[in-house]
């Protein structure tokens, strides 16, 4: 899983970059006009927490963001995943890391996370840890984002998928408390 990567190209005109998300194929297409800059598999929202469809723009970018409500309660050596309102009395709370956050709607964004072969997020778009830094560099605040059930590019872009992260063991919960998870990303290389 950690070795998975996809080629990416830098744009000639960053103002012409566009992002299209296919919910049915769980794919992101980053384009500059007719030129494909990056095609990547992602995980999108599940049935109960769907990724919103529509036309958006990137409104905020933050390389090291933490969630405000979901995360980890900890006390001494004990750590457990929870919502902030469910943390045990007397325990501290640290929001879940959301590296390479690119927000397109309040509370929704692209970020690093486990990419699974089925819709499974809380509505955001999860990117593979090796592809998130590439995406982050390609988009800017103001980049248009179109999210729909399908995209025209779906018919033309087949790609090998990373192994399904579903059955993989998660990292130790303590990794999410510090900065270790933010440091897992490869330095992006472009064609």
Residue positions per predicted region:
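Cell wall/extracellular polymer interaction/catalysis modules
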Residues: 1-76, 80-91, 182
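Exported/periplasmic cell-wall-interacting domains
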Residues: 7, 46, 50-53, 72-191
